[in-house]
Amino acid sequence: LVLDLSNPEVQEFVYKSVHDILKDNPQIAFVKWDCNRAVTNPGSTYLPADEQSHIWIEYGRGLLNVFKKVRDSHPDVHFMLCSGGGGRLDYGSLRYFEEYWPSDNTDALQRILIQWGNSQFFPSIAMCCHVSASPNHQTGRTTPLKFRFDVAMQGALGMDLQPSTMNEKEVIFAKEAIKTYESIRNIV
């Protein structure tokens, strides 16, 4: 179900839901705003019949309104926009987020093309690129840790690894790779 964000009452409901959680839990420092549901049956019970063709514009405006209100109310919370799945990534949205997640596909080989494509339009440093496990849980592909770090250094480096499952050699390599990334981050 996709909420009808062309409706100001729905916008207020979404804003208040997020705002109340953050207000009541001041220890929350990070929020990933996931947008994994595409609109498959567009229409609005709020918009008049002769404005149904405006749903995409009004939905977008409503979503941006919610983003703005949440950010204005919680300027110290770090927000990540997730476009994996629903494709919700544009400059209008990005101005309310420090970073974005370009795809739920974390296979390093496939991420090369995904990240390259994203970098043609959006700033690389805002693109979250994580080192994930090998074999990859989506493709089953086994890739060396160095390759996974090299690919993840194309944007904002992160790790989707459990350090407790890494051997000593991998931990040492990861620490060195992170130091290398920190020395080149200003170039990214």
Question: What are these regions, as identified by a protein language model?
Answer:
Residues 1-146, 156, 160-171:
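Active-site neighborhood of glycoside hydrolase catalytic domains
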